[in-house]
């Protein structure tokens, strides 16, 4: 129902917010890719291919792509899928062009990618998903396998080392070595809080990476360790009544905190995929069941038969305080939340998981 709603609302997938060639479009389209892989329905494949054909010229150039940020790279992961689907040389060239953006991409002193070329020294947990959804798939299916996998592990390890809170597996929203960054602690450069959706991006990329990299890949165990620590802590901070997670994840008893649909759906996807892929045992089955029930309470049909998703923010950057996170405007059908619910619902309703 959600996929059908999206195709009615956005007959052209490039019209999905927030602009042409942007990470929410890539995120949403991966939901359609998974749905196509589970159902074989051509309408879902065609929807994704329409986007790819609209953006990639015969010479492989990509309209809208600049490589200005990790966000700008994310939709390139859909082009890796298009290349695998079609074998067309233009998609290979397009993937190579996205890969080339990493050649001069700015890094901090740890070797970690800045979130954007315009954000000196800043690493956001969100950026791991944005950059590595492409980079890991390029290595797995296009080329430069060893280097792509090594870089993927390196970036995950850097952010984990810089952003983990108190050996919990939970990560603060970001880290900056730039003393001018307003949200960064003067003591250690960290953001002040653990944002639900930000942690959700990190959670999802962990299972995506583990599903794509062979077990013998150097650094695989460190990524698996991060996932297993994260799952154990997420179980502890899941709201037992609603099955959902809070906007500021670990402040479960702090006044004003509320259940974030976007991050909660991302966590549900992560738990489900981790379970299906054998990255964890059955100890999280109840977390998954309660999480799915909770997500369903945030999705309501309107009189036209369209599914609407409630209680999430649109495009939230790193904030300076707890109050800023909890008072950020909530929107119906926030672009990240809708796509996250699509990912989670497909994972819950179909046993097979793309690897």
Region locations from a protein language model:
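His/Met- and acidic-residue-enriched segments that coordinate or traffic transition-metal cofactors
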Residues: 6-19, 59-62, 128-132, 149, ...
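CBM-like carbohydrate-recognition segments
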Residues: 1-26, 38-45, 54-76, 82-98, ...
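Long, well-ordered core segments of solenoidal/helical folds
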Residues: 1-14, 43-63, 93-112, 146-172, ...
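Carbohydrate-binding/catalytic loop surfaces
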Residues: 27-33, 70-83, 113-127, 169-194, ...
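Inter-helical turn/loop segments and adjacent helix faces that build the functional surface
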Residues: 39, 86, 138-150, 209-221, ...
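Oxyanion-binding "anion nests"
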Residues: 201-252
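Acidic/serine-rich, low-complexity amphipathic helices located in mid- to C-terminal regulatory regions
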Residues: 126-141
């Amino acid at each position: 129902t959600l996929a059908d709603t999206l195709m009615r609302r956005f007959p052209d997938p490039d019209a999905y917010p927030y602009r042409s060639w942007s990470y929410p479009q890539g995120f949403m389209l991966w939901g359609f890719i998974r749905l196509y892989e589970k159902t074989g329905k051509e309408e879902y494949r065609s929807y994704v291919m329409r986007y790819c054909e609209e953006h990639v010229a015969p010479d492989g150039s990509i309209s809208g792509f600049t490589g200005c940020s990790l966000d700008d790279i994310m939709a390139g992961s859909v082009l890796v899928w298009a290349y695998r689907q079609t074998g067309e040389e233009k998609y290979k060239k397009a993937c190579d062009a996205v890969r080339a953006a990493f050649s001069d991409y700015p890094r901090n002193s740890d070797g970690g990618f800045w979130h954007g070329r315009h954000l000196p020294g800043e690493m956001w947990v969100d950026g791991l998903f944005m950059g590595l959804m492409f980079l890991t798939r390029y290595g797995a299916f296009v080329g430069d396998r060893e280097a792509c996998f090594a870089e993927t592990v390196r970036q995950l390890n850097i952010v984990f080392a810089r952003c983990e809170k108190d050996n919990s597996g939970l990560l603060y929203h970001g880290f900056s070595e730039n003393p001018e960054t307003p949200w960064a602690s003067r003591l250690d450069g960290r953001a002040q809080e653990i944002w639900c959706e930000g942690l959700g991006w990190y959670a999802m990329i962990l299972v995506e990476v583990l599903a794509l990299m062979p077990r013998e890949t150097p650094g695989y165990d460190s990524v698996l360790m991060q996932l297993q620590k994260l799952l154990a802590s997420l179980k502890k901070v899941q709201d037992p009544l609603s099955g959902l997670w809070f906007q500021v994840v670990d402040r479960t008893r702090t006044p004003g905190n509320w259940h974030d649909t976007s991050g909660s759906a991302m966590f549900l996807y992560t738990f489900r995929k981790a379970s299906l892929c054998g990255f964890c045992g059955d100890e999280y089955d109840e977390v998954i069941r309660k999480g799915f029930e909770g997500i369903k309470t945030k999705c309501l049909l309107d009189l036209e038969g369209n599914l609407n998703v409630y209680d999430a923010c649109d495009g939230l950057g790193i904030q300076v305080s707890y109050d800023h996170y909890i008072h950020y405007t909530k929107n119906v059908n926030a672009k990240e939340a809708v796509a996250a619910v699509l990912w989670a619902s497909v994972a819950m309703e179909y046993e097979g998981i793309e690897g």
